[in-house]
């Protein structure tokens, strides 16, 4: 690949063929080069030598961009134009500036496929929602529907199952499998979580350290796949976390969160209705529910990001909302990561500056940290195994590496309350276990409280003490 972009090229020449009838999973660690391989397949980057040859028969079009569709699930609302801020989803006065779902879906030439997709993903109930109001899982359903309606010859999907509830994941497996049987569609899945490989996949291509491995059958891959250790975090790092000194600005209240008969509406749609919820100091909550059930909306109230909280009976860290406290007085107690946060951080800053922005809860770094604060940033980057990325620009990192940087940002000020909304999105199996280890160790410290959202039961750390399940409608 183009030699003036060394970070965007494979270290060795790529030999790869997608033969008729094949469906491939590309697997590898975060930062291994999986996305670079996709960019090579799609023709995004010019090559140093040779060329990518295409034969899209029986499609009448010969153009790669018409036959190959690539969905990169990056938790974004539309294009990355820099105009999005992560609280925007909760501000009703911004809604008129964003389109409705129905305005963005193309006309379908195959009415049967359209009906199947609409039923599978519940698109009918989304049609009159503003695109910015879609939850992370709903956004994935919209993106999948939009792309599949265009009848691609080759469909490339980057981690398509993350963010989807278990029922929808199973249905998507089935739908893709059926489409590969009754149409000429061929599928390439880019997977960080290699145990997400569906049964219709025929071959696997491992990618490691920007080297494309040999294509092998799924059965061959499953036979040689190595298990991940039950614990990744070293004893030395575990002790460092447990021995962290406590800061002097701790809250002194038994109840961290108190919600009394809280209801949230957007237009005619009720997201939360008469919700009572108390989170006590030291509790570790798992928050779950189907896509679109209101999980992220609930967290936006706790994080002081949702303006509707002022009209509700909500007490955070012992102070009732609307009693004169600033949002920054609330946020200083909270470490937070979410799909919306990831979307807002598509900024070309050094990774360590992204981590440092967590000290002041800003999107971007507007105040240079003190030396001891920068040392804390480097400390947490080392804990998450990304110390070598500190000077790399954020946009040069893979999606999984970006997520690790944002996790370091959430922990950097040693918060009393951790709010982790699908924190393991896009992480490979090794890094998932590492992050789980860090979370469990951190939460063993006195009076540390956590709220975590995930659609994968196995992602929940062993320290979870309480469960809240939200039902849609």
Predicted regions and their residues:
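The feature captures the beta-strand-to-loop junction immediately N-terminal to the Walker
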Residues: 27-29, 288-290
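ABC ATPase nucleotide-binding domain signature region
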Residues: 38-109, 299-363
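Conserved ABC ATPase "signature" region
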Residues: 109-126, 356, 371-389
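Conserved ABC ATPase signature
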Residues: 130-134, 138, 367-369, 393-397, ...
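Hydrophobic anchor residue at the start of the ABC signature
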Residues: 143-144, 407
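Catalytic Walker B motif of ABC-type/P-loop ATPase nucleotide-binding domains
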Residues: 155-159, 418-422
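Conserved beta-strand-loop-alpha-helix hinge in the C-terminal portion
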Residues: 199, 209-237, 462, 470-473
């Amino acid at each position: 690949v183009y030699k003036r972009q060394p970070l965007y090229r494979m270290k060795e020449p790529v030999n790869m063929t997608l033969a008729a009838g094949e469906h491939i999973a590309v697997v590898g660690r975060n930062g291994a080069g999986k996305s670079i391989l996709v960019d090579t397949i799609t023709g995004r980057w010019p090559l140093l030598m040779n060329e990518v040859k295409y034969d899209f028969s029986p499609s009448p079009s010969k153009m790669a961009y018409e036959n190959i569709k690539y969905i990169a699930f990056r938790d974004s609302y539309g294009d990355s134009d820099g105009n999005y801020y992560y609280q925007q989803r909760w501000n009703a006065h911004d809604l008129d500036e964003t389109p409705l779902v129905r305005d963005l879906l193309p006309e379908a030439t195959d009415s049967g496929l359209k009906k199947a997709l609409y039923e599978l993903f519940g698109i009918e109930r989304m049609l009159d929602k503003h695109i910015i109001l879609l939850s992370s899982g709903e956004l994935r359903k919209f993106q999948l529907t939009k792309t599949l309606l265009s009848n691609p010859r080759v469909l490339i999907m980057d981690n398509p199952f993350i963010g989807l509830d278990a029922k929808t994941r199973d249905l998507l497996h089935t739908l893709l499998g059926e489409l590969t049987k009754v149409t000429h569609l061929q599928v390439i899945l880019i997977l960080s979580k290699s145990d997400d490989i569906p049964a219709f996949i025929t071959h696997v291509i491992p990618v490691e350290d920007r080297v494309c491995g040999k294509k092998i059958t799924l059965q061959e891959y499953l036979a040689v796949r190595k298990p991940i250790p039950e614990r990744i975090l070293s004893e030395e790092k575990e002790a460092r976390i447990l021995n962290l000194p406590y800061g002097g600005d701790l809250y002194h209240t038994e109840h961290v969160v108190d919600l009394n008969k809280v209801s949230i509406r957007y237009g005619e749609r009720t997201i939360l209705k008469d919700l009572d919820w108390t989170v006590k100091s030291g509790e570790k909550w798992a928050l779950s529910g189907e896509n679109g059930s209101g999980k992220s909306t609930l967290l936006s109230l706790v994080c002081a990001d949702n303006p509707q909280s002022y009209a509700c009976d909500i007490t955070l860290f012992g102070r009732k909302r609307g009693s004169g406290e600033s949002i920054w007085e609330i946020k200083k107690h909270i470490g937070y990561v979410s799909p919306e946060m990831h979307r807002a951080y598509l900024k070309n800053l050094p990774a360590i500056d992204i981590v440092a922005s967590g000290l002041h809860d800003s999107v971007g770094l507007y105040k240079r940290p003190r030396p001891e604060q920068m040392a804390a940033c480097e400390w947490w980057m080392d804990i998450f195994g990304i110390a070598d990325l500190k000077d790399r620009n954020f946009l040069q990192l893979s999606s999984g590496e970006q997520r690790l940087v944002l996790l370091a940002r959430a922990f950097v000020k040693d918060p009393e309350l951790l709010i982790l909304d699908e924190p393991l999105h896009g992480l490979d199996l090794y890094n998932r276990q590492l992050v789980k280890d860090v979370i469990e160790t951190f939460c063993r410290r006195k009076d540390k409280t956590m709220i975590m959202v995930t659609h994968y039961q196995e992602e929940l750390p062993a320290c979870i003490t309480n469960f809240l399940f939200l039902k849609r409608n």
